[in-house]
Amino acid sequence: MIKNIDRHRILILDFGSQYTQLLARRIREMGVYSELWPWDVAAERIQAFHPQGIILSGGPESATENDTPRAPDIIFTLGVPVLGICYGMQTMAIQLGGTVSNTHQGEFGYAPLALKNKNALIDGLEDFVNANNEPCLKVWMSHADKVTKLPEHFTCIASTETCPIAIMAHPEKHFYGVQFHPEVTHTLQGQSLLKRFVLQICQCEPLWTPRNIIDQTLSELKDQIGDDQVILGLSGGVDSAVTAILLHRAIGKSLTCVFVDNGLLRLNESQQVLNIFQDQFGLNIIHVSAANRFMNALKGIQDPEKKRKVIGRVFVDIFDEQAAKQKGVKWLAQGTIYTDLVESAASGTAKSHLIKSHHNVAGLPKEMKLGLIEPLKELFKDEVRQLGLELGLPNAMLHRHPFPGPGLGVRVLGEVKQEYCDLLRQADAIFIQELQKAELYQKVSQAFAVFLPIRSVGVMGDGRKYEWVIALRAIETVDFMTAHWAELPYDLLGRVSNRIINEVKGISRVVYDISGKPPATIEWE
């Protein structure tokens, strides 16, 4: 087994770009470990991390303002390569003696970039040749400020029509700045440029692979747990599923999984979870049927946030009750992943604005005196899926669309009732079945049905009936931060509507949600 597979590591300092997590994932895809820290992290932490290279992300601020973020000065004294992207390039230029100006003429979208001088970062990269016989790249720009004077010993490597210094470099120190975004797919040679920086200039060895991650994680789990007992809340989602299989591989029957059927799951989901994890993989599972308990707790509650809190509280109560029945349990396992920690600002890297309180991070029962095990906390979702494939989990489970923690509790608008959940489950299953038949399920990022607690008139035979309404939602997105409604074929939508109205008794109308994000969110509640 290869040890210390994260010994070659890239540190990314986050200045607030919407693409920063994507940047970290791009580096992981090369097989190199990367971490994402806030820009104002303490200098001692950076030194202790021992990065092989440092990347400064983009950001929404103007580098021309005096009170905007700056990189810790220590990064320019460590003797490691530094790559500044967009805002990261601008703050690098200012901090090293250059000038950045707001020209009131930004660049947004595609731009042809002409390579003026040879450099290790971009030599051999080319999308086309321009009329001046210069090799050019098609890049994605998103900036209003630009570097107008180079720091001492820097060279201009590339230009666009409105940005004379689009790439700058200090060849001896291996400091580089690019005004565009290499991490997005719109920059055609972006991944090649990042690979050049990480693998060649920083000389990182690609050891961060699914097989190596599994081997190292299993070894660490065995050392950490020994002969102790571990308890895990199994939801059937990707994160808890991979956590369960990893722990089962490491400690076998010392793992007890608690699976709570809250009555808010998708059609047949409870049985599918038991079939896979209990029958196929042989996990020790305590199955708690608690639909009535959840429905009683939700009675009369319409506010979405209150519903979320009630569902979370009841789950914790049930989990506590089951944990108390187990003898000798010393560890609580969770499927926390890296994005949970980043978004909850709970990784303790520096001051960071709290984006949201994630249920895995903020919802721990305070009275539980158990050690915490989070074997996936350094992994992004796509890495977790890769581990799942290596571990033998079904592809269909690993690539299911996201499902909210409160389940159908936030897809039934207003008060949650068993009747509403039953209707919604059937309608949702029909929608997903038809998407799969049309081979469109994996082409949309997320698709689901929503129950609207309003009665609409319909005609059934010779009579008029007032029955419920179902809304269908399908979106396309790269990062779930912004999304476009999926332009599904009309004939598909027609089939789905006809099936739901004919097969789900109590539904008389089906509508399709064509709202983007923003202004709408992906979920209705």
Curated annotation (Swiss-Prot):
Domain of life, per the record?
Bacteria
Q: Catalysed reaction(s)?
A: XMP + L-glutamine + ATP + H2O = GMP + L-glutamate + AMP + diphosphate + 2 H(+)
Record GO terms (molecular function): ATP binding; GMP synthase activity
Domain GMPS ATP-PPase span(s) in chain numbering: 208-400
What InterPro entries does its record include? Class_I_gatase-like, GATASE, GMP_synth_C, GMP_synth_GATase, GMP_synthase, GMPS_ATP_PPase_dom, NAD/GMP_synthase, Rossmann-like_a/b/a_fold
> In this record, what's one Pfam family?
GATase
Q: Which NCBIfam families match?
A: guaA_Cterm, guaA_Nterm, PRK00074.1
Q: Where does ATP bind?
A: 235-241
Sorted alphabetically, the Gene Ontology cellular component annotations on this record are: cytosol
What is the recorded name of this protein? GMP synthase [glutamine-hydrolyzing]
Q: In which pathway does it act?
A: Purine metabolism; GMP biosynthesis; GMP from XMP (L-Gln route): step 1/1
EC number from the UniProt entry: 6.3.5.2
Cite the active-site annotation: 86 (nucleophile), 181, 183
Q: Which residues form the Glutamine amidotransferase type-1 domain?
A: 9-207
